[in-house]
Amino acid sequence: MNQLEQLTPLTQTQFIAGQWLAGKGPSFSSVNPANGEVIWQGLGADAGQVDAAITSARAAFYTWSAMSLTERLVIVEAFAEQLKEHAELFARTIALETGKALWESRTEVGAMTGKIAISIKANAERTGTVENPMPGAKAFIRHKPHGVVAVFGPYNFPGHLPNGHIVPALIAGNTVLFKPSELTPKVAELTMQLWQQAGLPNGVLNLLQGEIATGKALASHKGIDGLFFTGSSNTGHLLHQQYAGQPGKILALEMGGNNPLIITEVANVDAAVHDIIQSAFISSGQRCTCARRLFIPKTANGDAILAKLLTSTAKIALGDPFAETQPFFGAMISDKAAAGMVKAQADIQAAGGVSLIELTQVTPGLGFVTPGIIDVTDASPLADEEHFGPLLKVYRYTDFDAAIDEANNTSFGLSAGLLADSETDYQHFYRRIRAGIVNWNKPITGASSAAPFGGIGASGNHRASAYYAADYCAYPVSSVEAQAVSLPASLSPGLVIE
């Protein structure tokens, strides 16, 4: 069987103990949000299959964790080579299933391979062995894998974000149960096929496809030692409550944000507008780091920036992800998501928000929406929630500190940014803003994989899916070791050995 034949569509939806199996749970499907075509159908995993996958992962753990790091890295690097070899297929699969423009889908695959190299480096630098001499012995700090861990992936980056958990978990010696979003099963299936071709031993990575019932069966199973989650704040909070009484399980959460972007004085109006658009509307606004709230001063410079933002936003090209002339963004993940953004806008309008550019669902039943900008300066207080799409709320302000206070008026704390020519303004902003990612004169959707990624408050509890992922994929073990037992030269007071 050649490689292309191995990558043909499957009728089996689950990968358990090295075997492709049909699911035994409810049927579900994946729909291309750009044209409404059903591109994948299958049965989800039931509770029995979840149990079987965990049993398989537990059995594989002892062999996998006993392998040398070098041996594990050979397989991880082989997966990276598979990604490079099938990069275009992977990118087209992402675009087909998510509606994301092909140019951006290609960057996602590139980020996946880059993340592998960073994960290898992070494991060496953050979880290596430290040896210190002491009288009559040696003291060691080593790291051990947790065991069997679950990875829950999101739909917005269905390859890159699960990859950011799976790769460091495997490098550390864990075995993994991968539960992807039910909206992107086709990308998950391809991911698993490439791991299979890379030579991953049976049971080390198991794929469990399905909807809510599958996820609940996995998250609540006593046989897992931890769960790594990227997704909505609501689901993450439910997981946090569920795991509150289980201190023995590691829980890493990377969730959303109600992210602020503040402007003070910027001479380069065009560049400021570019960074605002990149912050708010990239990926149809479906990035957890996207700007949701824009603070613009009531100044002539602020007026100029807002005016150009409106004219430039109105010209944003959206369309078919595979169009020869590529759009800035394609469709949202689903018709439901698109309709949800229309409703969110209506709710804000009802609270007194004034639409400067109306967000519209282009075609009923599909995921295309035009970007929207709504002035909420004089609106009633709004709910602190993440609107996961291309809708930007504008606040006009006269006092910088008051703008920062309002930017911090959220339970979230993922990303924040300042566009300002003044470094003094930035230092003032940096000291006061609450966020795990803080940028100056750069889009707030930009983050380095070589740095921590994540937030505070309702945005998460670990720096997931980046350099610091090595920290939650293994735990430190302190040891004092000697070649033989020995009697000390002097005994403690009151102690006699005879």
Swiss-Prot record:
GO MF terms, alphabetically ordered: succinylglutamate-semialdehyde dehydrogenase activity
PROSITE patterns in the record: ALDEHYDE_DEHYDR_CYS (PS00070), ALDEHYDE_DEHYDR_GLU (PS00687)
Gene3D superfamilies the record matches: Aldehyde Dehydrogenase, Chain A, domain 1 (3.40.605.10), Aldehyde Dehydrogenase, Chain A, domain 2 (3.40.309.10)
Keywords of this entry: Arginine metabolism, NAD, Oxidoreductase
Record-listed NAD(+) binding positions: G231, S232, S233, N234, T235, G236
HAMAP family associated with the record: Aldedh_AstD
Function, as annotated: Catalyzes the NAD-dependent reduction of succinylglutamate semialdehyde into succinylglutamate.
Record protein name field: N-succinylglutamate 5-semialdehyde dehydrogenase 1
Lineage, broadest ranks: Bacteria, Pseudomonadati, Pseudomonadota, Gammaproteobacteria, Alteromonadales
Gene: astD1
